[in-house]
Amino acid sequence: MPVSIVIGSQWGDEGKGKIVDLLSPDVDIVARYQGGANAGHTIVWDEEGETEEFVLHLVPSGIFHEGVTCVIGNGVVLDPKAILEEIEKIESLGIDVEGRLKISHNAHLIMPYHKAIEAAQEEDRASASDDDEIGTTGRGIGPAYTDKFARTGIRVVDLLDEDVLRRKLRRSIEEKNAILRDVYDAEALDVDRIVEEYVEFDQKIDDYVTDTSAYLSRALDDGARVLAEGAQGSLLDVDFGSYPYVTSSHPTAGGCCTGLGVSPTEIDRVLGIAKAYCTRVGNGPFPTELDGEVGQALREKGGEFGATTGRPRRCGWLDLVALRYTCMVNGFNELALTKLDILSGIDELKVCTEYRYDGKTTRRFPSEPQNLTRVEPQYETLPGWEADISAVRHVDDLPRAAQDYLAFIENYLDVEIGLVSNGPRRSQIITDVQPMAAA
């Protein structure tokens, strides 16, 4: 198992953190390949009978497992203040981070002006039209990636040379202040304060910085097992999602190679993570969205509030048209289905199997947002189940209707479900699922 990838197959918040946490004891390295502190991976574990919850935004979830090294790759945009706060919080739990966290010297940095510009942009969009507002997390992710691809960004390696950092920072801040003042009529930032603050980060972050691509290459040559994790979900990919209501990077499988510097030939497992229903945060088309009591019930029972922003998530029925699309884009050879327990108590479950558009039905997912807003989901209705399944550990102990639900998904997608999560805790997992399609 050279490299396995864990990928969100919907609009994010699928439960990737729990699955990475589950798989981490069997690997040597867990590596994050894109995104920034706009993603929140929630880990819930049991220690001596007590349940504890921890939300990670940047450090891979493998940090909770002794002997596992964690990597933040070059594809990540890094907020130095956020990463240092997260490290401090992890260490306060008695978990050793020293020597176990490696940060790419080529990762780009998120600066205060990125957050200021993002806030100004969102305010400007909102004043123009509610439909134009993308609904970002306010963490400066988009503007940081903008600078990266404009080749004006500041990278982690720049923190290590004070003269270079001061020169680049002053030039960038003066440029961004002109945009804030003249375009958005917003308050300018204090150049000297930001320069001094970021010069200090060098002393605190230096021990973690390395060429992570070279590190991973050597580790793979030595037979290391690597688990790569993305942030957000495939339907938020900047190229393959519902543009412009997307993130600014590539959560899809291809992002792993460019975000870590590993060869595609090293990848042998692509594991898609999907909820048993759908959720979405922020604006953008959502064909199976439920506005009534069922949607509210899913939100409350599933705790569907953003781990990063706290915003309520929009909830809807499982969309197999969309999931089939992300299976195609990523080449999943296995799925993990999460939050199956949340569906207990619903008499009838609807699953979207086709879209109706312009008088015709199709199984093709239209990535163009203007078309996606006009499709009408066509549903298959499946029987629900009443039983609380959160204590089930073997697939044969699930209610027949729950087993049929899993089999229906497998048959439609032609992808096996290898894992089923039926609760937030580490122990709430069913691993003997295959082959459900034959059930």
Swiss-Prot record:
Binding positions (GTP): 12-18, 40-42, 313, 339-341, 421-423
Gene3D superfamilies assigned to the protein according to its UniProt record, in alphabetical order: Adenylosuccinate Synthetase, subunit A, domain 1, Adenylosuccinate Synthetase, subunit A, domain 2, Adenylosuccinate Synthetase, subunit A, domain 3
Keywords from the named record: Cytoplasm, GTP-binding, Ligase, Magnesium, Metal-binding, Nucleotide-binding, Purine biosynthesis
Keyword GTP-binding belongs to the record: yes
GO cellular component, one term: cytoplasm
InterPro entries: Adenylosuccin_syn_GTP-bd, Adenylosuccin_syn_Lys_AS, Adenylosuccinate_synth_dom1, Adenylosuccinate_synth_dom2, Adenylosuccinate_synth_dom3, Adenylosuccinate_synthetase, P-loop_NTPase
Catalytic residues identified in the record: D13, H41
Binding site for Mg(2+): D13, G40
Free-text comment on the cofactor: Binds 1 Mg(2+) ion per subunit.
GO molecular function, one term: adenylosuccinate synthase activity
UniProt cofactor(s): Mg(2+)
Coiled-coil region(s): none
PROSITE patterns given in the database record: ADENYLOSUCCIN_SYN_1, ADENYLOSUCCIN_SYN_2
Subcellular location: Cytoplasm
One GO term (biological process): IMP metabolic process
EC class of the enzyme, as a word: ligase
Residues binding substrate, per UniProt: A307, T308, T309, G310, R311, P312, R313
Residue numbers binding IMP: D13, E14, G15, K16, N38, A39, G40, H41, T137, R151, Q232, T247, R311
Pathway: Purine metabolism; AMP biosynthesis via de novo pathway; AMP from IMP: step 1/2
Record PANTHER family: ADENYLOSUCCINATE SYNTHETASE
Role: Plays an important role in the de novo pathway of purine nucleotide biosynthesis. Catalyzes the first committed step in the biosynthesis of AMP from IMP.
Subunit relationships: Homodimer.
Protein name listed in UniProt: Adenylosuccinate synthetase
Taxonomic lineage of the native organism: Bacteria, Pseudomonadati, Rhodothermota, Rhodothermia, Rhodothermales
Gene name as annotated: purA
